[in-house]
Each structure stands twice: as C-alpha cells, then as structure tokens.
C-alpha cells in the first residue's frame, strides 16, 4: 500500500533524526506510522530492507530536486535560461540539500557515519511483492553514479531541443560534469557562502554559458 509505505518511511526518517540507526526499532517505526509490525515486515522484509528503501527514496528525491533546480523559475514553455546560471543554481542547491540532510550527504560522499544505515550498494536478493521494494533491493547509486545521473539530467535539460552540433553537446556535457564534480567536492569540504558560484564562473568555459 503506497500510503502505508510512505508513512513507514516518514516514521523511520523521524526516528533516525532522534537516534542512531542501530537503536531504531522496527516495532517503534510501525507504531509511529499507525500500522502493525507485520505490515512493516510485509512491506520491507527486514530492517535492512527498510534502510535500502530509505536510501532509495532520498536518492530519488535528490535527483528530482536537481531537475527542478535545472529547470529554473518561470514559465517552463520558455525553456531554460542561461546554462551557466542554471548550472550555478543547481550546484548551489546540491550543496545546500546535502548540508541539510545527513543521509543525502552520505550518499554523495560515500562517508556513512555510525548513526546512519549503510546498506550495501550492490543489489540484494528480493522476495518482496512490492515493486517499490524490489527496486530498493536493486543497486543503489554510488557517489560516482550520482555524477553521471546528474550530468545526464543537466545535459538533457540544458540541451533544449537536442539540435545542437555534436561539438556543442560534448562541450555542454563536459561543463555539466565539471559543475557536478565541483558541487560534490563542496559537499565534502564546504566553501564560504557564495563561493560555489565564484568557482564555477572561474572554471566553466565561457562559450558554454552563452
């Protein structure tokens, strides 16, 4: 049941904010969500399954946020604004979102503290009847995977109609990857406020921002 699943994930997230993952009890998560413990196990299979589902949801939410940042404000029919501005806004959003969410920060850097769940990134055997859990039991994105996922989304959004010359598309892809890698480095070692934009202005090819 999607609603019950989301309630359970919300409850697990709230529990994780208050105590280390090792101290989070399945029975408490179920009670907080207002469902039976059996419903919790039916949905996720195990505590590790719940951890994988949490990470999968945070990864999906983060990538959705990246797409919103890339699209920018205003009428979506008018197309994206200047690529440099959108890449800068996206890089700043990436850093801010990671700063505010320890689970996202761990996914992007690969540094999982003892307070957090740390499920294996490789796929695990799944016997779940829930499609969402079968997906969560599949491979989870590594920091390197995030670089490719965000870069490809940036190229798709900023490339517009896709009618650009191959050389322009390749340059855009390089600029997008550079912006993503710079943003992720800033997640690990945050710079001063506003420094991300200054760094991007210094390193992005001027032609790609026209």
Where are these regions (language model features)?
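Basic, helix-initiating cap at the start of DNA-binding domains
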Residues: 1-32, 49-52
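Solvent-exposed, amphipathic alpha-helical segments
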Residues: 11-18, 61-72, 182-186
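Short hydrophobic/aromatic patch on the recognition helix
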Residues: 34-44
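DNA major-groove recognition helix of helix-turn-helix
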Residues: 44, 54-55
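Amphipathic alpha-helical linker/stalk segments
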Residues: 58-90
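An extended, acidic
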Residues: 84-210
């Amino acid at each position: 049941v999607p609603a019950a699943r989301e309630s359970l994930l919300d409850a697990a997230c709230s529990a994780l904010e208050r105590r280390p993952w090792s101290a989070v009890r399945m029975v408490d998560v179920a009670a907080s969500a207002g469902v039976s413990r059996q419903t919790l196990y039916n949905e996720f299979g195990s505590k590790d399954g719940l951890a994988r589902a949490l990470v999968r949801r945070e990864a999906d939410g983060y990538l959705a946020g990246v797409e919103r940042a890339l699209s920018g404000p205003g009428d979506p029919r008018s197309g994206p604004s200047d690529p440099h501005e959108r890449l800068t806004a996206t890089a700043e959003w990436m850093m801010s979102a990671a700063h505010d969410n320890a689970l996202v920060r761990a996914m992007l850097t690969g540094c999982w503290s003892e307070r957090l769940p740390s499920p294996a990134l490789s796929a695990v055997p799944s016997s779940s009847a829930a499609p969402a859990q079968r997906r969560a039991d599949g491979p989870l994105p590594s920091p390197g995977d995030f670089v490719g996922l965000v870069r490809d989304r940036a190229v798709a959004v900023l490339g517009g109609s896709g009618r650009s010359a191959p050389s322009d598309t390749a340059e855009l892809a390089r600029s997008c990857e550079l912006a993503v890698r710079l943003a992720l480095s800033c997640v690990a070692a945050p710079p001063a406020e506003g420094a991300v934009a200054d760094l991007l202005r210094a390193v992005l090819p001027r032609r790609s921002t026209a």
